Amino acid sequence: GNPIKNDKGWKIEKWENVLKIVNGKNQKKVENKTGKYDIFGSGGKIGKADDWLVKENSVLIGRKGSINKPLIVKEKIWNVDTVFGLEPDTDIINYHYLYYFCCFYNFEQLNRAVTIPSLTKRDLLKIDIPIPPLELQNKFATRIEAIQKLKFRKLKSLEKTENSKIIQKFLALK
């Protein structure tokens, strides 16, 4: 069912009951080109760090700027101060389900700024989220991962085919 419309009538919880929001911090003190952890801004990966703030299997959402573009992180990461880390309580909610909920949720409705879109932790914690049985969430996650792997293989195959065509055209010019 649609996680926003909740047409299945699942129990509704506030975010404050099913996840932890991790505030980002300035990365200057932990930044290191050979660091073990990725640094994420609201637009994606921006560097490496020696420390982490957000645990693996979490979701990132922009606090300022790109507020409607969630990201999944499967490893521990450092999030900068323009990004919130969402760490789901894994006894209640699967991170894939949380990610897709965030993809469909309109964070613009919580926007408090006029020029640069901006979200507050207090408003986010009050978001209602339908909670399907964890077993269904996990089945959904398994399907999504299988689809993503298939998509990746198909893209690699297309890329290989395209590269082969380019090489053939180049060799035909000689």
Question: How would you label these PLM feature ranges?
Answer:
Residues 59, 108, 117, 139, ...:
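General helical secondary-structure elements
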Residues 26, 106-109:
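Structural motif corresponding to the C-terminal cap of alpha-helices
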